[in-house]
């Protein structure tokens, strides 16, 4: 951990790789307020990585706390299946797997559906979501 104000190299270069796992369907929500009666716009953020690598929490700069406070928005970041877990086409094995090549995209759709249903509990406006 950082031990002084001058020692920021760990903060800048630290990657939180966490534990890789196909059970990665999580999202993070930052909100500046819940019980103040406001309906805030929602920023729905999908990390980069070319659908092959990355996560919503791998860098400290990915945390949405400051953006939520300064922008008065609700920030949602998501994880989704990547690489083979997200895009392997298993449709040759039957109808059960006909959409398997789109798992990553379906994860994103499921996260957006969750936002539509639940974001009002975090002070967000489900009708005002920016991706």
Question: Where do the model's predicted regions map?
Answer:
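Aromatic- and Gly/Pro-rich amphipathic surface segment
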Residues: 1-23
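Serine-hydrolase-like catalytic core of hydrolytic proteins
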Residues: 15-131
């Amino acid at each position: 951990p950082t031990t002084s104000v001058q020692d920021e190299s760990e903060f800048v270069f630290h990657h939180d790789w966490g534990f890789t796992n196909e059970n990665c369907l999580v999202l993070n929500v930052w909100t500046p307020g819940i019980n103040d009666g406001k309906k805030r716009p929602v920023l729905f953020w999908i990390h980069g990585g070319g659908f092959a690598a990355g996560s919503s929490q791998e860098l400290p700069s990915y945390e949405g706390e400051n953006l939520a406070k300064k922008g008065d928005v609700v920030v949602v970041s998501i994880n989704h299946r990547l690489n083979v877990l997200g895009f392997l086409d298993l449709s040759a094995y039957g109808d059960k797997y006909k959409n398997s090549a789109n798992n990553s995209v379906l994860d994103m759709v499921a996260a957006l559906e969750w936002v539509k249903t639940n974001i009002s509990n975090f002070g967000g406006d489900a009708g005002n979501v920016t991706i």
